[in-house]
Design a protein with these regions (language model features):
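N-terminal strand-loop-strand
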Residues: 1-29
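Conserved hydrophobic/aromatic beta-strand scaffold that supports enzyme active sites
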Residues: 10, 19, 84-86, 107
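Short loop segments at secondary-structure junctions
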Residues: 14-16, 88-93, 110-112
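Short aromatic/basic micro-patch
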Residues: 28, 79, 107
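The catalytic Nudix box helix
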Residues: 29-64
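Active-site segment of metal-dependent pyrophosphate-handling enzymes
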Residues: 53-93
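NUDIX/MutT-family hydrolases
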Residues: 84, 95-127
Length: 143
């Protein structure tokens, strides 16, 4: 089995979340493999920018997820362990990167995003992240 460390972002603009539709018609969160000793924070920020055109800022860590799949190109099982960061976008502006195989991107209200997101694990992560985001934003407003 091939083990890969990855990093990604759960990006909010106000009360909306950023998700993408990939080449397999799956609605996912932006993420990528950590290579050459890069920091997970940097990889997460770079993948968000590269995949969606959004210049987000990290406001907190969210946790980790892990999933396994069989890679047809590698002909072996792969385990991706992903470190997730809660991020805030400066504006509701994005840019679809079709060169990476993405078909759609956008900021969606929580209910719509949860309906669209393909994987249960990602839906749980988004729900948890939304709660944490609201708590952090309320703390900042009161400060």
């Amino acid at each position: 089995m091939l083990f890969r460390n990855c990093a990604g972002g759960v990006v909010f603009y106000e009360d909306k979340i950023l998700i993408l539709k990939n080449e397999k018609d799956e609605w996912v969160l932006p993420k990528g493999v950590i290579r050459n000793g890069s920091l997970s924070r940097d990889v997460a920020l770079n993948r968000v920018k590269e995949e969606t055109g959004v210049d987000a800022e990290i406001i907190s860590s969210v946790g980790e997820t892990c999933y396994e799949f069989f890679s047809l190109t590698r002909q072996k099982p792969v385990c991706n362990e992903i470190t997730w960061y809660l991020m805030k976008a400066p504006e509701e502006k994005y840019e679809l990167n079709t060169e990476l195989g993405f078909k759609e991107v956008g900021f969606f209200h929580l209910d719509e995003a949860l309906e669209k997101i393909t994987y249960n694990q990602d839906r749980s992560l988004v729900s948890l992240s939304h709660k944490k985001y609201k708590e952090l934003m309320n703390t900042l407003i009161r400060a």
